């Protein structure tokens, strides 16, 4: 919005030309989202407390979590608000990639909101019925994937980028839709599963979004894309603004979500942020990179799959409790230790993922 306005005002004052620089807009996008999140935090927490929108804690969970019962949840609303406002202010409104991310972000946020509402108002720990949750998540993911396929069919936008191989980028055809679907829905659920401890999900999300900001900048730059042997996608550059907005909003939320948390993001935040990371990876053609950089989310999800599968097949559990962060809690690790160590692992994985762009 402001970019469009600046383009019309630059003829009156050349200083408005600064709005055309991607690096400038990336920085102010981050700061805008950060300040909005920090400003909304105390007000959102007070309002949620007034409405008695408190966290519902499972009785079969770790005993240390019982003290979290009643902590305001649905704080993801302030994350999404900060991201959307910042992106609308600083990104080019004509960029289709930006709108794809916003559709998934807001759409998954609405699904998460309904899920949270059922939990906090009806005191139902299960929330929205699983089949309906997956149905609407699938509708959004398939809708966006199909639209992207129609527009980008037989172009670099539908190629599969394989790490470590510079010339292996096959056309996916209709498999593009299937891959995009699983990445978007899978990442949404993976971040949701990870969001079980104070600040555990938001910091890896910030790290991954920051990594994708660098990838988006390189993908949208013809020279760097050629240098790194990745597809050049002319719309990808504006995803930098989206990624930095996620970073800013996430850091602002962490101010209130750090241990001991004053507010939880709820499904409205975790589903939306996971879906956003998924669609960003799809748009940048970096699904494999997401698996590496988002390794914490992958491990959390695999721990649940293995736990359920093992119990059904053998009648035995692999972990003391799943997702795996609860396993370490029950082993006696203090919650802050689990959180910070997972953060460190996440940062390492993002750096490793970025390094793979050059190792080809």
From Swiss-Prot:
It is a multi-pass membrane protein. Residues 1-25, 93, 153-167, 220-235, 284-287, 359-360 are periplasmic. Residues 47-71, 115-131, 189-198, 257-262, 309-337 are cytoplasmic. It is an enzyme of class 2 (transferase). CDD domains: GT_MraY. GO terms for cellular component: plasma membrane. It catalyses: UDP-N-acetyl-alpha-D-muramoyl-L-alanyl-gamma-D-glutamyl-meso-2,6-diaminopimeloyl-D-alanyl-D-alanine + di-trans,octa-cis-undecaprenyl phosphate = di-trans,octa-cis-undecaprenyl diphospho-N-acetyl-alpha-D-muramoyl-L-alanyl-D-glutamyl-meso-2,6-diaminopimeloyl-D-alanyl-D-alanine + UMP. The keyword Cytoplasm does not apply. Keywords: Cell cycle, Cell division, Cell inner membrane, Cell membrane, Cell shape, Cell wall biogenesis/degradation, Magnesium, Membrane, Metal-binding, Peptidoglycan synthesis, Transferase, Transmembrane, Transmembrane helix. Belongs to the glycosyltransferase 4 family. MraY subfamily. Catalyzes the initial step of the lipid cycle reactions in the biosynthesis of the cell wall peptidoglycan: transfers peptidoglycan precursor phospho-MurNAc-pentapeptide from UDP-MurNAc-pentapeptide onto the lipid carrier undecaprenyl phosphate, yielding undecaprenyl-pyrophosphoryl-MurNAc-pentapeptide, known as lipid I. This is Phospho-N-acetylmuramoyl-pentapeptide-transferase. It comes from Escherichia coli O6:H1 (strain CFT073 / ATCC 700928 / UPEC). The lineage of its organism: Bacteria, Pseudomonadati, Pseudomonadota, Gammaproteobacteria, Enterobacterales.
